[in-house]
Amino acid sequence: ISDDIQSIIQGIF
């Protein structure tokens, strides 16, 4: 789950 959050953040940036 933690990786999913970071993946979304990187996708935005």
Swiss-Prot record:
Its main location: secreted. Keywords: Secreted. This is Venom peptide 8. It comes from Brotheas amazonicus (Scorpion). One of its GO terms (cellular component) is extracellular region. It is found in: Secreted. The keyword Secreted applies. The keyword Secreted applies. Expressed by the venom gland.
